Structure formats: structure tokens, C-alpha cells
Amino acid sequence: SIREYLCGEAMHGLKIPSSRSLIIFTGEEPVFRETTEPGAMIVRSASTHVRFGNFEYLCHNDKKELLPELMTHVIEEYFSEYNELENKFELFFESVVRKTAELIAHWQTVGFAHGVMNTDNMSILGETFDFGPFGFLENYQPNYICNHSDYQGRYAFNNQPNIGLWN
């Protein structure tokens, strides 16, 4: 959690869209990562907590009929300039793709490797959050993997643009 706080602040300082930390607190229970360590939680502030995974969830749980309702809500809340347009869903999609590409381009510029770019960790507004096992390149290593459990290199530094597009 402290790493996530520090990285969020660093990203903000680098002018890369990012969630910010409101509070960090510890608990009594140990957590099991690579080693056992004290548990901690972070409460983040972000422009939205709507993720790609919110849409994916509906698709994978036979609730596709709810997609237009979710998209309409998201457009009303975050893309109101598209509200009255006939092709608002298309414009929304294009905007999410553009914001994601811009975010990942920022990451690549500073050598940031996210580590867990699954759909639940990707913001529809192109903000960095859910840092997890992130890392920064100390020297140029295109295949750099910061996530110790990413044995296949799915989220390797040089694969981030592909994963962003796939998501």
C-alpha cells in the first residue's frame, strides 16, 4: 500500500493521469504475497472507478442486455458531450481507446510497467490505478516483467500497448 501511495504521487508529479491516495491503514491480519507481511489497505480517489471489467462482467455473465444501460449511464456521467448524439456509443468507445492509448504512451515514456493490466485494473477514463506489482525500468529492458507471477510475460513492459488494445 505504501508503494502504491508513492507511485500514485510520482505519477501525479509526472503529469500522468493517476488515482490519488486518501488514506492508508493497517489491519491485524497478515497477508500472504511472496512472503507473509502485515496487511494494509489504501482508499483511493479517482475521477471514476468504472473499469473495463464492469462491461466485461456483463458480457461473461449473460447480462449483455444491460450494456446499453451501463454505457448510457457512463456517457451521461463522464462523456456528456456525446449525450444527444446518435453515435454516442461509438464516440464513447473511441474516446476510451484514445485515453487508454495516451495513458500507456505516458507509461512507456517514463519506463513504467504496470504489472497487472487485466480489465478490472483499467479505467475507462485513462487513469492509472490498482498499481499492484508495478515497477520502473532502471535501464532499457523491453521484456521487463515486474509481476513475479507473470511467467509468460503477458504484462511485460513492451507488451503493455498490445494489452491495452486487447482490453
Positions of PLM-derived features:
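Catalytic activation segment of kinase domains across protein kinase-like and atypical kinase folds
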Residues: P30, T36, T109-H114, N118-L165
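Conserved N-terminal phosphate-binding loop of PLP-dependent enzymes in the Aspartate aminotransferase
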Residues: E90-F93, N162
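Conserved ATP-binding subdomain of kinase catalytic cores across diverse folds
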Residues: S1-E86, E102, I124-F129, F136, ...
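Glycine- and acidic
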Residues: E81-E90, D150-N158
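Mobile, glycine/GP-rich and aromatic-enriched active-site lid/loop segments adjacent to catalytic centers
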Residues: E102-V110
